Amino acid sequence: MPETNKYQYCMYNNEVLELHVLEEEFYRNKQETKNRYRGQLLCPGCRQVRLSINENSNNNSIYLAAYPNSHHSENCEYLLNSATKRELKVFYDQISPDRAEKMLEHILEDRVAVVNPPHNQNLNDDVNKDEGDNYKLTNENGTRKYLPRRSLQLRKMEESDHLVMYYGECRLFIAQGKWDNFYLRIFRNDETTNFLCSLKIPKNVFNYLSDEINFIPCEKDLDVNNSMENSVLARIAFISTIEKKSSFFDGKITHSKLLKVIQL
């Protein structure tokens, strides 16, 4: 994942401001949005670094970047470099199911947890130090690295040849395909209900997940329009690579520990 996508949310007036919310506002009025937030957006990890709004070269998405010569606190996760493709594969292959579950649960709850820090916590202290370790790995050389994450509620879905933690509020439907594979279809939860991506789930993995995802409609009908019309609202977090095929994005859940779904 590019470094430009590291900040998926920030702090504004001591509250969480999601990047996808900021992005929607930006594309309604670019200059007004820049003026409103100039100098007001802070790093969500340490709240010591101011962030600026920048537009990607495709003119269809934004990212947040630290002001020049600004410095994160020593333990801030946003100070770290992103883990490499190989480091991510090794980490997620070896992660225990318990830690994986806590990590995915945390990212689904994180927006709430960070809004209300303990009353005795200094706002310049690292926020949620212990929980923040959920998003770090230590490689074989003892170097700590940042685990890349991306909101499903941003304007653009992107390919990724390395493992990324995706999360967000969306609509879900399961299509049962040939050879006992299942496909978790993810749609936007907005007026467009656009098809975001499809996650292939092999039958042996699906069986482990059946209790958690049994509220999601499952049919053998592979028609995308049918899937969208019958989809249900949920919050989801998963870890996968993403490949673009034709006009659709595809991923795969290789282990039950790498998917968490919460019914809304």
Language-model region placement:
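N-terminal cysteine/histidine-rich coordination modules
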Residues: M1-E109
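Charged linear interaction tracts used for macromolecular binding and regulation
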Residues: F91-A234
